[in-house]
Amino acid sequence: VKTASSNYSIYFGNDFIKSFPLKKISNSKEIFFIFDSKMPDLSIRKVKSFIRKSMPSKFDSFKFIANEKNKSIETSQKIIEKLIDLKFSRDSLIVSFGGGITTDLAGFVASVYLRGIEVMHIPTTLLAQVDASVGGKTGVNSKKFKNMIGAFKQPAAVLIDTCFLKSLSKRHLAAGYSEIIKHALIEDKNLLSKLDNFDQNIKKKGNITELSNLIRISTKIKANIVEQDEREKSVRAYLNFGHTFAHAIESVQSFKGLNHGEAVGVGMVCAAKLSLLLGKINSQEFDKIKSLIKKFNLPTKLPANCEPAKI
């Protein structure tokens, strides 16, 4: 990914973390590990082992329950105070391990601690792999609204290892498919065709390989847009398709109803419906968008507790 502020690589593979040389990315001897406490112990140990192989002179960590409530200034402050107490320097590297909430939080902390230190993401959810970990947007929630506080902070690298997807529930996988659908709808008819024919059972032989291919295509679409418009002055706004409604839905539900990917699914249907009413698309195109979202077990209607007037 080549942007005005920095260039970095996205690495893909299946169960490659354990043998990946961290020094290929950073020579930092001070590494701070931020991870989701809900991750399986085996996975956490695997990543800690990967970090320790680089023989850092200083290593510490911060674990938290990755939910929208904890994606906050308060959690950021706790991490920053720990970094200060342990005297982590400007040459430090933060390694994030978890879903989009974790990458957003870690990226935000990295952007403000000592006016900016390196961060590397190891995203573990499909949504984080195809969207949240790529592009440099970081943020935390205010008391009432999502992602109101943030900064742009491009990572030093992103390691996308599909082995972590195997422990995801169908609901969390579906949340990630919503972002792949979004990328297909805004940019790539061939990806739309692949989604139409895709078998979602990743435990079926060969399907994880096909999913890896979808992830590569999807991240490339996002990376290409980010390269053109890092700070969202023009074409990067296309990546917000479905998100204007989605963030409102999540806020109205106080982050206790639909997860982000599900809200994006509903948001894309809402945006498509608005496009239909404005004459920008026809009814056949609207039906195709809605049916594709349904295929991936995503909701297509506003939840009962979401009044349109509040959204």
Please report, for each region that a protein language model flagged, where it lies by residue.
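ATP/NTP phosphate-donor binding region
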Residues: V1-L93
